[in-house]
UniProtKB/Swiss-Prot annotation:
The gene is rbsD. GO terms for biological process: D-ribose catabolic process. InterPro entries: D-ribose_pyranase, RbsD-like_sf, RbsD_FucU. The lineage of its organism: Bacteria, Bacillati, Bacillota, Bacilli, Lactobacillales. It comes from Pediococcus pentosaceus (strain ATCC 25745 / CCUG 21536 / LMG 10740 / 183-1w). Signal peptide: none annotated. This is D-ribose pyranase.
Length: 131
């Protein structure tokens, strides 16, 4: 059995296959995922698992050099923005319109669906390198 915190086999595989500048998205239960993009559906109930639980777990495994968030999170979900910044205080953030973020999912290796039910709880993680 794996010793690390990430025990979901699909998430482990996707993260292991990622290289520098590759992207992975984590989002709320309502985010539409483009056809052809792998969706790893973890949602089991309202808020289970939460966006922050999944993000925290992924950050145990993935080196992240930049994150992308919807511009709307600033006004529509400032608490979630505060939580993300607290978890990743040194990581640069690029804000974009939510409509552009949905289009950018086409450039992600996978989308991880959580049980989160709060608006604009979506992130794109850009992979860094560990050396």
């Amino acid at each position: 059995m794996k010793k690390t915190k990430m025990i979901n086999s699909d998430m482990s595989r996707v993260i292991a296959q990622m290289g520098h500048f590759d992207k992975l998205s984590i989002g709320d239960a309502g985010m539409p995922v483009p056809m052809g993009i792998e969706k790893i559906d973890l949602a089991v109930d309202n808020g289970i698992p939460s966006f922050m639980q999944v993000l925290t777990n992924v950050l145990e495994e993935l080196e992240v050099q930049r994150i992308y968030l919807a511009e709307e999170i600033k006004t529509e979900n400032p608490k979630m923005l505060e939580n993300i910044k607290a978890l990743m205080p040194e990581t640069p953030i690029t804000f974009m319109p939510h409509s552009d973020m949905k289009q950018d999912l086409n450039n992600c290796h996978a989308f991880v669906r959580t049980g989160e039910m709060t608006p604009y709880s979506n992130i794109i993680l850009e992979s860094g390198v560990v050396f």
